[in-house]
Amino acid sequence: MDHQPRSRIHREKNARDRLIRLVNTHPDWALGFQDERWWSRFALPRLHTWSDTGDSLHLVEQSKRKDDPEPKALACYGILLRWMNADAQLHEEVWLRFVDGRPVSAITIQFLEWCCTKLEAKGKRVLAMVWDNASWHISKAVRRWLRQHNRQVKAAGHGVRILACYLPVKSPWLNPIEPKWLHAKRRTVEPNGTLSAHELADRICATFGCAHEDHLSISKEDS
């Protein structure tokens, strides 16, 4: 962060804060903090506990067997959503979609389409979305899709527009989904072996209280 002009950091943070305040005045808007995360089946977060003898206990990291056909890690798109209920109470939930592969622009677009469909069903008209400057967020394909999507929503008179707000580079503390990722990694640790990819995804979704949806993927022709 040291190499970034301080004025730019403040400007982008202020844009995020203005967007948050704006959402609070529109009951048919939703505020979304979007991010992606890799979930390893083998690497363990830093955890420790204590035995009855007072000795520190540590988890033992597992190794991938040669006959294990599943991936070492799963990529996941997530969005922390907040909106005001009819009784003026703040509502919050997390939506997740796992990926067969890695985050790319085409998958990002699929995820945003899915979010808009779900939000429209909940009566929302605008998704005010905060996210970082990952290449699959700022690519020409994603920016073009955002413009086209918003034009189509305006022309049709229904749907969910997206207002995208980009965070300063390397500023995870400005995205409140980040600590939720860390908390979930600690809660989904398997101390007695290795979870399959499906078991890991199930456990992560259960931690966030959301359904384990079909994984997002793209064809080889689109990759």
PLM-predicted stretches and their roles:
Residues 124-138, 167, 175:
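Acidic/histidine-rich, metal-coordinating catalytic segments
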Residues 11-114:
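Extended, low-complexity cationic-aromatic segments
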Residues 2, 36-40, 46, 81-85, ...:
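Short, solvent-exposed loop/turn segments at secondary-structure junctions
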Residues 27-29, 161, 170, 174-223:
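C-terminal anion-handling pockets and recognition modules
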